[in-house]
Amino acid sequence: MKIIFSPFFGNHVFIDLDKKGSLIGQKYAGSQELIGELRLRSGLTSVLPDSMERTAQYMKAIRSTFKENKGSHAEIFRSSFGKDELGVAMTLLGWRDALVGLGWNPSDYTKSQKLNALMDIEKHFDCAGVADCKRELLETLQAGQADLSGITIESVLPEGMLPCYFAALLSAAHKCGAKVVYSPAPSAAAAEG
């Protein structure tokens, strides 16, 4: 199978079939489609809950943190949480997901009270989101725990122009047997005159 990838492809990519011919054995994939395809082929299938379900689960985790640990770092959010549970849960979950997407390890305490608060809440939260799935996929491929032979991933962008996560993902996919082809880097052309 050949996956033609660009992080800038959306859900619907126009393909001129008169010029292209058949699409059998090919798939055009944006970011989420590539992640989904590689997760499926790595045996990491999962159904993600919607954002409101995750927010509700995070609210429960915050409540549990307050209830079970009176001296928790999360106490800094108690007053705000008492006034707007949903808003605070949405904000903190957004912070958490952004940090997970950047490789945050919630087991290492830091000098940051807010990070430590998120770590305390994390102990009561088990509801994976997109950032968790991306991290799990990258870790699985980097550990060589998938067989991706028979897959060709053709990046529309040169390797140096890919966002960091996707550059690492394609490199890890290559180590698992996928053939990865990058478009050539654009050459610099001097203006005439």
Write out the residue ranges for each language-model feature.
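Short, hydrophobic beta-strand segments that form beta-sheet elements in well-ordered domains
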Residues: 1-14, 154-156, 181-182
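Basic/charged alpha-beta structural segments of nucleotide/phosphate-handling enzymes
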Residues: 8-149, 160, 164, 186-187
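Histidine-centered acyl-transfer/condensation active-site motif
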Residues: 151-161, 173
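Conserved RecA-like helicase ATPase core segment
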Residues: 164-193
